[in-house]
């Protein structure tokens, strides 16, 4: 999975619905998606070797009362939707905490060209 790191720093830290707004978490999920794309492209030999996104799982570090995990996950899905033609399946899961205090983590399964 990828957390929202840019230039070695998290773009936000804390629980969504408490320290992190849903809008900031949406943007953090976009960063996670781009980081996942970069990691997969490196393994596959370039972004042009990635045919499509199959599945996206978005973990959202949520305050006890936050129930908008799907809106945060839209940050990743919307990003992939702009880059790939075919839709993907997705899960959005609320969790108590993530590594380094990240507000979200995105796990992606890509299909590489054969």
Model-derived features: where do they sit?
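Short, polar/acidic, helix-capping and beta-turn segments at strand->helix junctions
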Residues: 2-114
